[in-house]
From Swiss-Prot:
GO terms for biological process: cellular response to virus; defense response to virus; innate immune response; positive regulation of immune response; type III interferon-mediated signaling pathway; tyrosine phosphorylation of STAT protein. The keyword Secreted applies. Disulfide bonds: none annotated. It comes from Homo sapiens. Pfam families: IL28A. The gene is IFNL4. GO terms for cellular component: cytoplasm; extracellular space. This is Interferon lambda-4. The lineage of its organism: Eukaryota, Metazoa, Chordata, Craniata, Vertebrata.
Amino acid sequence: MRPSVWAAVAAGLWVLCTVIAAAPRRCLLSHYRSLEPRTLAAAKALRDRYEEEALSWGQRNCSFRPRRDPPRPSSCARLRHVARGIADAQAVLSGLHRSELLPGAGPILELLAAAGRDVAACLELARPGSSRKVPGAQKRRHKPRRADSPRCRKASVVFNLLRLLTWELRLAAHSGPCL
């Protein structure tokens, strides 16, 4: 082959690679509409284990307040809510000691890592300003809450893990990207 042909092929490959690399990431959450049963069973087992542990604490100085309902599905707030829940769950589960982890906790951590990356990609695609609040809407002021102990915080995140995986992540997958 002549040098000009090689140059043309090289230029074509360079353009192709540049276009592929510059292509925006897609927001793909549809595969979280139904999760692998083994992962859900591991999340249930972890929750049950922590429930038994919490009952053995004696004095109940943890207040497991019910969570507010997640934001409406038409807003980017749901994706941000799910992203915060995933980050909390990853932090707590990766900080557990070996004795506290169940054998099936590995798939939970893998699922959380993948879901965290996918939700972050969806949030990156959101146009700036699309999730702004309605002008004039006032934020309710809440009394400052007493901070929970690390043990209570860990138990709360573990108790809410199943809800995060089976309800909140699924709703985010059904609602699609926020644009």
